[in-house]
Amino acid sequence: MSSGGLLLLLGLLTLWAELTPVSGQDRPKFCHLPANPGPCRATITRFYYNSDSKQCEKFTYGGCHGNENNFETKDKCHYTCVGK
């Protein structure tokens, strides 16, 4: 195979890896935890991965404790639990 063909193949494999969503088995375990606002009383908008709907959804975080399924932005949630 020529060097141009190898570069094309490498480029296609890289593109495929970037566009392939994360499978349920590849997600961090905390992505399957329910939203947990914690015991504090702040009203901070955060996002969590809902494993039933398979989407990142908004919830109100109280500001302390909770769990790791708690993201400042929908993009961070999506990148971590849905895929790149």
Curated annotation (Swiss-Prot):
Residues 31-81 form the BPTI/Kunitz inhibitor domain. The modification Pyrrolidone carboxylic acid is found at Q25. Its main location: secreted. GO terms for molecular function: serine-type endopeptidase inhibitor activity. InterPro entries: Kunitz_BPTI, Kunitz_BPTI_sf, Prtase_inh_Kunz-CS, TFPI/VKTCI-like. Disulfide bonds join C31-C81, C40-C64, C56-C77. SMART domains: KU. Residues 1-24 form the signal peptide. It is found in: Secreted. GO terms for cellular component: extracellular space. Pfam families: Kunitz_BPTI (PF00014). The record marks R41, A42 as: Reactive bond for trypsin. Keywords: Disulfide bond, Protease inhibitor, Pyrrolidone carboxylic acid, Secreted, Serine protease inhibitor, Signal. Serine protease inhibitor. This is Kunitz/BPTI-like toxin.
